[in-house]
């Protein structure tokens, strides 16, 4: 016991030293156990309270941390520091209390229960302490991160503030420096002006720089200077000064040249010191070199000048040239020397020879005798070798007579069937004509011009011409539309003795570059190939302008397969005493062509075509002719579906595609071609065995040219023509062609033609055979120009492309529609329904009214006046007829006639007399009435599709529903140029409504529909008299 007491004494002493309350044990075990239980329960309660308080504090700390993360203010940082210090104090106090509890644990004589409780307490205290340590570590790490973040933020703000201060300081220094430099520069300039002046021996352009610098300095001094501008000015001035000094310093060294490079200015090279003073001075160029070389204002001026020059040149071309003021150099036309063999021939022998050569007929005096071989026409050995090389063995009938006539210098009209060699007939004399003249000099135009109606024919003639021109050293240029003009201009500028052209593009070439591309001053030989077709297609004005610009003593030659009499009078205007040579009659199909005409229904045409293709296509190439571009494309698709590879050729195809198609067809790459009449002229294809007129030709000459594509150069050919009963009017021309060519006419074709003649006679119509040559070209007069301008203005206004700077403002399309409407407006006062326009008469009034009527009838019967008189006259006529007497002409007073005429005039002028208006107002004032608004819009003169757009049932119903106005169609349609008779009116729309706004809405909707249709028609405008050929 002594030891135990001593032991407890020591613990109590230690407790006393630590400042805690001392405990003493009682000698009784029972009392000690109760005390221990009470103490353990109190400790448990304390621990639970501590844990709950610690949990609350942790949660509050976590919330505080989240709030502190979002906040960056220093006040909250200080409060956080205070909270952290308090938490540290609490943790220290908790650690001291735990140390006291651990030292006050019970000895080994305690009960198991107490020991277990103490052990559980120690374990829980150990777990709590470890958790607290982890939390403390996390809090310390977070605090360090926060402190580091705050330090970085503060450091960044401090750096930014210092940076701003340095920038402001640098700007202030630069501003001061710039002002000082400007002052120094001014002083230097003044010193340079007062002292000796530097000079460049080779460059005088910089002498004005000091004055300019002084001026700039004064201007900048007068106004507030921007520091950056001042700095840049300073740099420029220093660079100039540096360049001046370097150039001045290098002036003493002879032959010193080297580039002076700076950061701002481009390379400046000094010249040799010793230079002739008469040479051109150099130029010091700054950075803005592009501005010196290019200016949009200068470009506009150039464009305007070029346009004015082009229009002026074109106007000059359209005007005839005064050849009396131009001195042309003489030239020789007559090269023909008749050989003795031909000179010995008598006139009878000549006539017999001409008859043997397919019946050559000659008109005109002084025509030479026909030749029999190439040698007799007087051509050079080079041409003779070329003829032999290309297989021309002997002259054809047209060549035997045409070549000596042209060689004699005479103008010629050559008429021969297709494939007879007309091209060689005018080419060989042309070569002889050109070789006799001097060679071309720079800037001179051609000597010979060949004009054709189509591009394909121009290319074919060019190809034929080049066979001979290469050996002769002559240059040939083909000028036609549809391709780039720049290449053709380049070829013409290089010079060419021969030009093969289409008329439209030739005029463009003559007008290009103010006439510097080419000219007609040296032209002495003019050829018009297919002349009739050229005039028929509307090229007469262009051809005449070109021909009128050529010297009057030229030699002009015309060739064609057909030459209607109507064209001959026109052609003789440009020929001088021509000789007409005709071979084989006028417009005859070659005898080598077997012609077949089939009367067939439209639906069976394609099957018959497939039958012909199956029979003939293996033997050679085939051309199928149609009348329209749309039909050509449609037939192409049908043939492709039937597994027949083919191509189409018409005026709507691009020129490059047309050239490639013709080349492929000539080479045999493609053996089937669907074409319009664009391929009917001058197209020479070898091995062409069949021509099918899928669409019947509409005139005789067209048939001859189509059939003439086959059976050329002595080969056998076949021509089939499909004709339907609806095309009976064309049967006469086909019968004529068959008869003239000696082919039997099919019976069904004769029957079709006779039925058509009988039908026309029964209807009282005269049958007219059309030659087809009724085309009309441009007149180039004021009327056409005005129409073209109106069309352009209408299109610009519709699309909103009108330029405000145009002198002639575009006519508003709405104003045009309004003027064409010829609108008539009326407002009528109508009586309200259910009301009477007159008061109900009483008995006394009825008697008086009856007496007044009888008196009025008697007066009218005596005087025959007014409307009642007309009724009385009609009654008298009726009574006279019933009694069987004669009817006398009623007498009508002048007043009645005048009133009727006045009413007609008022109706036309839409005029209501004042008397009627006052009567209507009085009637309206006496009775309840309403106004009815009426407006009439005349639509007779609008295009047909525009009329359909607003007169269809759906359109009228839609407009009525939209505007709540009644719309009716009245009047009769009258074609342009025909005026309505008395009592009739042109077709118009009558709009009626009790609301004026409804009438206006209906009119606006009708105007909108017509305007849309007019714009659509304008955008898809196609000329009605469009030719088959497209030549630009």
Curated annotation (Swiss-Prot):
Ranges where the Helicase C-terminal domain occurs: 592-753
Motif Q motif positions after renumbering to this chain: 372-400
InterPro entries: DEAD/DEAH_box_helicase_dom (IPR011545), Helicase_ATP-bd (IPR014001), Helicase_C-like (IPR001650), P-loop_NTPase (IPR027417), PRP5/DDX46/KHDC4_KH (IPR056149), RNA-helicase_DEAD-box_CS (IPR000629), RNA_helicase_DEAD_Q_motif (IPR014014)
Residue stretches of biased makeup (Basic and acidic residues): 26-49, 112-200
Residue list for modification N6-acetyllysine: 263, 776, 904
Coiled-coil ranges from the UniProt annotation: 152-197
Keywords on record: Acetylation, ATP-binding, Coiled coil, Helicase, Hydrolase, Isopeptide bond, Lipoprotein, mRNA processing, mRNA splicing, Myristate, Nucleotide-binding, Nucleus, Phosphoprotein, RNA-binding, Spliceosome, Ubl conjugation
Position(s), cross-link Glycyl lysine isopeptide (Lys-Gly) (interchain with G-Cter in SUMO2): 186, 325, 779, 908, 916
GO MF term set: ATP binding; ATP hydrolysis activity; RNA binding; RNA helicase activity
SMART domains (UniProt xref): DEXDc, HELICc
Function statement: Component of the 17S U2 SnRNP complex of the spliceosome, a large ribonucleoprotein complex that removes introns from transcribed pre-mRNAs. The 17S U2 SnRNP complex (1) directly participates in early spliceosome assembly and (2) mediates recognition of the intron branch site during pre-mRNA splicing by promoting the selection of the pre-mRNA branch-site adenosine, the nucleophile for the first step of splicing. Within the 17S U2 SnRNP complex, DDX46 plays essential roles during assembly of pre-spliceosome and proofreading of the branch site.
Protein name, per record: Probable ATP-dependent RNA helicase DDX46
Organism: Pongo abelii (Sumatran orangutan)
Lineage: Eukaryota, Metazoa, Chordata, Craniata, Vertebrata
Chain's gene name: DDX46
């Amino acid at each position: 016991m002594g030891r135990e007491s001593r032991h407890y004494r020591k613990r109590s002493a230690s407790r006393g030293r630590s400042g805690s309350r001392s405990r003493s044990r009682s000698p009784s075990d029972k009392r000690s156990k109760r005390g221990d239980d009470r103490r353990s329960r109190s400790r448990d309660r304390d621990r639970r309270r501590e844990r709950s308080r610690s949990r609350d504090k942790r949660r509050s700390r976590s919330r505080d941390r989240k709030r502190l993360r979002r906040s960056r203010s220093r006040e909250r940082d200080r409060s956080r520091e205070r909270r952290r210090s308090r938490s540290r104090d609490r943790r220290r106090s908790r650690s001291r209390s735990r140390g006291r509890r651990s030292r006050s644990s019970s000895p080994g004589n305690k009960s198991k229960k107490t020991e277990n409780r103490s052990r559980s307490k120690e374990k829980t205290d150990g777990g709590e302490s470890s958790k607290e340590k982890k939390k403390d570590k996390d809090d310390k790490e977070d605090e360090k991160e926060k402190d580091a973040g705050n330090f970085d933020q503060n450091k960044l703000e401090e750096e930014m503030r210092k940076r701003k201060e340095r920038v402001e300081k640098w700007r202030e220094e630069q501003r001061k420096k710039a002002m000082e430099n400007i002052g120094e520069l001014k002083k230097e300039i003044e010193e340079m002006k007062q002292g000796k002046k530097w000079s460049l021996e080779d460059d005088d352009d910089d002498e004005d720089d000091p004055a300019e610098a002084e001026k700039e300095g004064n201007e900048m001094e007068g106004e507030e200077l921007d520091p950056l501008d001042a700095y840049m000015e300073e740099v420029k001035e220093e660079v100039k000064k540096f360049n001046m000094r370097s150039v001045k310093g290098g002036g003493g060294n002879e032959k010193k040249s080297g580039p002076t490079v700076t950061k701002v200015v481009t390379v400046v090279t000094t010249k040799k010191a010793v230079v002739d003073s008469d040479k051109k001075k150099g130029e010091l160029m700054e950075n803005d070199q592009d501005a010196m070389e290019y200016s949009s204002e200068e470009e506009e001026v150039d464009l305007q000048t070029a346009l004015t020059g082009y229009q002026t040149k074109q106007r000059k071309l359209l005007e005839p040239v005064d050849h009396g003021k131009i001195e042309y150099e003489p030239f020789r036309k007559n090269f023909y020397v008749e050989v003795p063999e031909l000179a010995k021939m008598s006139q009878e022998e000549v006539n017999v020879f001409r008859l043997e050569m397919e019946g050559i007929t000659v008109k005109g005096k002084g025509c030479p005798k026909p030749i029999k071989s190439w040698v007799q026409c007087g051509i050079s050995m080079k041409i003779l070798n070329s003829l032999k090389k290309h297989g021309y063995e002997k002259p054809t009938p047209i060549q035997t007579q045409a070549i000596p006539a042209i060689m004699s210098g005479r103008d010629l009209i050559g008429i021969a069937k297709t494939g007879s060699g007309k091209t060689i007939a005018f080419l060989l004399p042309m070569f002889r004509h050109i070789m006799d003249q001097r060679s071309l000099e720079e800037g001179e135009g051609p000597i010979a011009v060949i004009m054709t109606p189509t591009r394909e024919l121009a290319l074919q003639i060019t190809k034929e011409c080049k066979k001979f021109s290469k050996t002769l050293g002559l240059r040939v240029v083909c000028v036609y539309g549809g391709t780039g003009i720049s290449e053709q201009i380049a070829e013409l500028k290089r010079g060419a003795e021969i030009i093969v052209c289409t008329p439209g593009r030739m005029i463009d070439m003559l007008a290009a570059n103010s006439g510097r591309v080419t000219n007609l001053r040296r032209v002495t030989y003019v050829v018009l190939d297919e002349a009739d077709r050229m005039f028929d297609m509307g090229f007469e004005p262009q051809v005449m302008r070109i021909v009128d610009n050529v010297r009057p003593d030229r030699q002009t030659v015309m060739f064609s397969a057909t030459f209607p009499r109507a064209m001959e009078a026109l052609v003789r205007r440009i020929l001088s005493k021509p000789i007409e040579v005709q071979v084989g009659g006028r417009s005859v199909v070659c005898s080598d062509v077997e012609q077949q005409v089939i009367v067939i229904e439209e639906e069976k045409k394609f099957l018959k075509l497939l039958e012909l293709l199956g029979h003939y296509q293996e033997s050679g190439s085939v051309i199928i002719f149609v009348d329209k571009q749309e039909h050509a494309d449609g037939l192409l698709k049908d043939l492709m579906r039937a597994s027949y590879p083919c191509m189409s050729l018409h005026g709507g195809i691009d020129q490059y595609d047309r050239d490639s198609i013709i080349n492929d067809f000539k080479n045999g790459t493609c053996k089937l071609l669907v074409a319009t009449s664009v391929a009917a002229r001058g197209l020479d294809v070898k091995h062409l065995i069949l021509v099918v007129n899928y669409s019947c030709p509409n005139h005789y000459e067209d048939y001859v040219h189509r059939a003439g594509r086959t059976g050329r150069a002595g080969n056998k050919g076949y021509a089939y023509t499909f004709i339907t009963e609806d095309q009976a009017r064309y049967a006469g021309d086909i019968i004529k062609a068959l008869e003239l060519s000696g082919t039997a006419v099919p019976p069904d074709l004769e029957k079709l033609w006779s039925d058509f003649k009988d039908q026309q006679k029964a209807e009282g119509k005269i049958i007219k055979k059309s030659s087809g040559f009724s085309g009309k070209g441009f007149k180039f007069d004021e009327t056409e120009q005005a129409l073209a301008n109106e069309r352009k203005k209408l299109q610009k206004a519709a699309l909103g492309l009108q330029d405000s700077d145009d002198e002639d403002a575009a006519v508003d399309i709405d104003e045009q529609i309004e003027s064409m409407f010829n609108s008539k407006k009326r407002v009528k006062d109508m009586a309200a329904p259910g009301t009477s326009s007159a008061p109900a008469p009483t008995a006394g009034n009825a008697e008086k009214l009856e007496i007044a009527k009888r008196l009025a009838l008697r007066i009218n019967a005596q005087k025959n006046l007014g409307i009642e008189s007309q009724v009385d006259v009609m009654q008298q006529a009726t009574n006279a007829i019933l009694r069987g007497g004669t009817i006398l002409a009623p007498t009508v007073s002048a007043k009645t006639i005048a009133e009727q005429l006045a009413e007609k005039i008022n109706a036309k002028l839409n005029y209501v007399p004042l008397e009627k208006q006052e009567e209507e107002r009085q009637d309206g004032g006496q009775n309840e009435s309403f106004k009815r608004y009426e407006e009439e819009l005349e639509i007779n003169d609008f295009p047909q599709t525009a009329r359909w757009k607003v007169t269809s049932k759906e359109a009228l119903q839609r407009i009525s529903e939209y505007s709540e106005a009644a719309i009716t169609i009245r009047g009769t349609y009258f074609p342009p140029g025909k005026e309505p008779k008395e009592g009739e009116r042109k077709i118009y729309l009558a709009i009626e409504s009790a609301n004026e706004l409804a009438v206006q809405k209906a009119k606006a909707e009708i105007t909108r529909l017509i305007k849309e249709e007019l714009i659509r028609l304008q955008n898809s405008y196609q000329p009605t008299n469009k030719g088959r050929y497209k030549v630009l």
